[in-house]
Amino acid sequence: MAYRKLGRDSAHRKAMLREMTTQLIMNERIVTTETRAKEIRKTTEKMITLGKRGDLSARRKAAAFVRNEIADIHEEKDAVVVKSALQKLFSDIAPRYKDRNGGYTRMYKLATPRKGDAAPMVIIELV
């Protein structure tokens, strides 16, 4: 499988992709550079496909990749409900795309490049 090196060694690149994929699942929209977004798109699509499968093996594979972070905290009837990024993937995001075969993300190019190095910036979001 082809991939971009993104100017990092393999461990740093994998950690960055895991972190940014988790952030996209939690926030459903992030701003990043165009090349990073193209790589994040691949991993996010795979995680959502695993979420749609929903069996134990898919949950374990997704749990191995998605970081264990808190996605949402809210109160329900005198109880505080804490939802992790993995729970959000399987309970909120995957059912939303049950009738859709791929193409779960959308990228918008921003008009202004990044200030320091003029890197092209995009907004990547879940459809």
Swiss-Prot record:
Alphabetical UniProt keywords: Ribonucleoprotein, Ribosomal protein
GO cellular component: cytosolic large ribosomal subunit
Single GO molecular function: structural constituent of ribosome
Keyword Lipid biosynthesis: no
InterPro entries according to UniProt: Ribosomal_bL17 (IPR000456), Ribosomal_bL17_CS (IPR047859), Ribosomal_bL17_sf (IPR036373)
One GO-annotated biological process of the protein: translation
Transmembrane recorded as keyword: no
Similarity field: Belongs to the bacterial ribosomal protein bL17 family.
Subunit structure as annotated in this protein's UniProt entry: Part of the 50S ribosomal subunit. Contacts protein L32.
UniProt-listed NCBIfam families: L17
Protein name, entry field: Large ribosomal subunit protein bL17
Species of the source: Lactobacillus gasseri (strain ATCC 33323 / DSM 20243 / BCRC 14619 / CIP 102991 / JCM 1131 / KCTC 3163 / NCIMB 11718 / NCTC 13722 / AM63)
Upper lineage: Bacteria, Bacillati, Bacillota, Bacilli, Lactobacillales
Gene name of this polypeptide: rplQ
